[in-house]
Curated annotation (Swiss-Prot):
The active site is at K40, Y263. The modification N6-(pyridoxal phosphate)lysine is found at K40. Substrate binds at R136, M310. One of its GO terms (cellular component) is cytosol. It comes from the Bacteria. Pathway: Amino-acid biosynthesis; D-alanine biosynthesis; D-alanine from L-alanine: step 1/1. Catalyzes the interconversion of L-alanine and D-alanine. May also act on other amino acids. This is Alanine racemase. Keywords: Isomerase, Pyridoxal phosphate.
Length: 366
């Protein structure tokens, strides 16, 4: 989807806030712990290349989801370690090795396929994934991990790290978290040749379970200034939300009692009122279920009326504002604020999803 620079809808990304958020977390973790910045999914909608360059002096490496995301960073001149968190099949290994990209290997089946396809792993850097209870990818026993590490070394790979991921580190009930932690510790203790790097700490673990940090952390959502738990747990230190979303009024009119607005005529005016049109819609990631939510105009909350369309939404205004008047969808407007978590709560989802759904049709301004 092409970025639409010739309309007023933009996302503003504060790179300094991201740098300060990472620094705040680093102050609360032990010295010598390696920091990976998680910039998958275009840095959660903030711009992977721009964020990675901004954090270059502060972090030891980056985590991405797949090979294409890793190659994007290499092509942008990022020369620090890049770890792919997802599974890369053996037929893509040559690109990974050629670009010094570290891969995750999560099963003995992967080794079997590599051997079947006669793939060598000479020069390949690997982190092994352990499934301690997340249930997605990873090995489940020390025996399996030992066999995998031995097999990888036979094929010429350098096994640098081993890691896991917690399912409930952002929840108040830490029963499942502790079960996973003990599972992982026991598995690590059973390794015959433990890799140099051991990491399990995502954003939530880094800030609420710092006593469980091994020797590396993966900082994702906290880097962008958001609480991993939404609003369930209090942050131990302040963060700055790095992304704001704004647009402008492009049409203002008065409607009369009985007039309807939007697809399905789901909104009927009870009296005469001003309606403003804003050029953002579900194609931009502002989903249809945002009808009834409010945005900010002139420091006042204005309700979204009628269904959100693909490219536009409509809001009830307290008066007739001039065309071009600023509309804030995420961020501050005259001392009032709408957070990404406010939107997530309204949608009954998580703040991660709100950011990741913001499409590339919305230009990012830095």
């Amino acid at each position: 989807m092409i970025s639409s620079f010739h309309r007023p809808t933009v996302a503003r990304v504060n790179l300094q806030a991201i740098k300060e958020n990472v620094a705040s977390v680093q102050k609360h973790i032990p010295l010598g712990v390696k920091t990976y910045a998680v910039v998958k999914a275009d840095a959660y909608g903030h711009g992977a290349v721009q964020v990675s360059k901004a954090l270059l002096p502060q972090v030891d490496g980056y985590c991405v989801s797949n090979l294409d995301e890793a190659l994007q960073l290499r092509q942008a001149g990022i020369d620090k370690e890049i770890l792919i968190l997802g599974v890369l099949l053996p037929n893509e290994l040559e690109l990974a090795v050629a670009n010094a990209i570290t891969v995750t290997i999560a099963s003995l089946d992967w080794i079997a396929l590599a051997r079947l396809e006669k793939k060598e792993c000479q020069g390949l850097k690997v982190h092994v994934k352990v499934d301690s209870g997340m249930g997605r990818i990873g090995l489940r026993s020390s025996k399996a991990v030992n066999l995998l590490i031995d097999s990888l070394k036979e094929l010429g790979a350098d096994v640098e790290g081993i890691f896991t991921h917690f399912a409930t580190a952002d929840e108040a009930d830490d029963t499942k978290f502790n079960q996973q932690l003990q599972f992982f510790k026991k598995l690590i203790a059973g390794l015959e040749d433990k890799p140099r790097l051991v990491h399990a700490s995502n954003s939530a673990t880094s800030i609420w379970h710092s006593d469980t940090i091994f020797n590396a952390v993966r900082l994702g959502i906290v880097s962008y200034g958001l609480n991993p738990s939404g609003s369930d747990l209090s942050l131990p230190f302040p963060l700055q939300e790095a992304l704001s979303l704004e647009s402008s009024l492009v049409h203002v009119k008065m409607i009369s009692a009985g007039d309807t607005v939007g697809y399905g005529a789901t909104y009927t005016a009870k009296k005469s009122e001003y309606v403003g049109t804003v050029p953002i819609g579900y194609a931009d990631g502002w989903t249809r279920n945002m009808q009834g939510f409010s945005v900010l105009v002139d420091g006042q909350f204005c309700e979204i009326i009628g269904r959100v369309s693909m490219d536009q939404l409509t809001i009830r205004l307290p008066k007739a504002y001039p065309l071009g008047t600023k509309v804030t969808l995420i961020g501050s407007n005259q001392q009032k604020n709408i957070s990404t978590t406010d939107i997530a709560n309204y949608r009954n989802t998580i703040n991660y999803e709100v950011l990741c759904l913001l499409s590339d049709r919305i230009p990012r301004i830095y």
